[in-house]
């Protein structure tokens, strides 16, 4: 089996340097161009199964890459990015100023620290492993 992992194209929140996992940001013009470029790179690749995060930026990237193919794209919440909880939508500087203790804890225990109202990296890994076990 060959597995292709593709990241979504750029969004305005990427440009601003914001942490966002669950915020449903749309692709920027550059992000759309990136997806079209990827479509060209992958045009000769045959896919048995296409799965994307249901968030607009990821799903639209998959739609652009696959737009001339007759394959269904399945959305799967387990592929969503990390839920950054109280950090969601903020820049690193904003997080430093607003939540310094939580940021220190996250930096010290990145894999296990659960951001308040969000997830830990271990949570994300668990979701991804669960998804991988279910690949047909």
Please give the residue ranges for each predicted region.
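Extreme N-terminal starter segment of soluble prokaryotic enzymes
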Residues: 1-4
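Short, intrinsically disordered, charge-balanced linker/junction segments flanking boundaries
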Residues: 132-136
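Phosphate-coordination/substrate-recognition cap region in phosphate-metabolizing enzymes
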Residues: 37-103
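Short, basic/glycine-rich phosphate-binding loops at helix/coil junctions
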Residues: 15-18, 101-113
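Loop-to-helix element that buttresses phosphate recognition and phosphoryl-transfer chemistry
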Residues: 10-61, 114-129
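Hydrophobic transmembrane alpha-helix bundles
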Residues: 13, 74, 84-93, 111-122
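Active-site beta-alpha turn of Rossmann-fold NAD(P)-dependent dehydrogenases/reductases
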Residues: 7
